[in-house]
Amino acid sequence: MHEAHKNGLLPDKVHSLIVDRFRVTLAGIDRIEKASGINFPLAYIEPSIVTSHPNASSFDYGILFARTIPVISNNKLEIIIQITAPLVAFGLKGTIHAILAHEFLHYLELVRRISKMDIVSDEISSNLFESVYSDSTRLFEPRAVFNDKTLLLHITKKFPEGFRDYKLEDKVLKLWIQKKLPTINIALDTNIIKIPVDVLANTKIDPILLQKIERVEEKVSRLRKKKLY
């Protein structure tokens, strides 16, 4: 992000706002770690907004404020969380923390699937749009992961059936996109990473993390049983 500012892509005022409000993001990561007992994965600030189109010919687009991305490095798979600069700059505390928590759930689900080699056709959508903001059925039940009641409220409030924050979207449109600040456009139907089987085989997951994910799965099972009775 500092490089983008140095190269003139981000105005001084916007850069200062991002730097100043970055503490809200750090506080969110710390909060998620305390509420789950699990370390947050590697994350970075993307100095752009990411927009996604259903297909190349579509005029409709969605804004992706953060993404959980599998990356192949040294013939191994790593999962990183990309946090967009406009979310840091313009998001309210509750919104930022809810989005970070939601991405954290994606991270845990991906680790679970990788550990079980449960990846359909050896492919993962690298923007995970259908998962990130609409398909919550593939995620762990937040109550099985977090013990922070306020954080859980933020998640359920922001992600009832798919993330929408009209005030934040309006701010990003007016203060970022219309001002021609850095924007990455991706098409949902072309943004797929193929993950070779040997890469999955080479990927070693921390056994302590796997134990914690197994405990989460047990909690999910107990919560489902409670719903049945």
Model region roles, listed by residue range:
Residues E3-K13:
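Acidic/histidine-rich, surface-exposed loop or edge segments in extracytoplasmic proteins
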Residues L17-V24, L92-I96, L100:
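Short amphipathic alpha-helical segments
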Residues I18-P41:
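Zn2+-dependent metallopeptidase catalytic core
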Residues L42-V50:
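Long, charged, glycine-rich C-terminal linkers/tails
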Residues A56-G94, V111:
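Active-site scaffold of zinc-dependent metalloenzymes
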Residues A98-V111:
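Active-site recognition of the HExxH zinc-binding catalytic motif
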Residues R112-F159:
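Post-HExxH zinc-binding segment in Zn-dependent metallohydrolases
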Residues L153-Y229:
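Pan-zinc metallopeptidase signature
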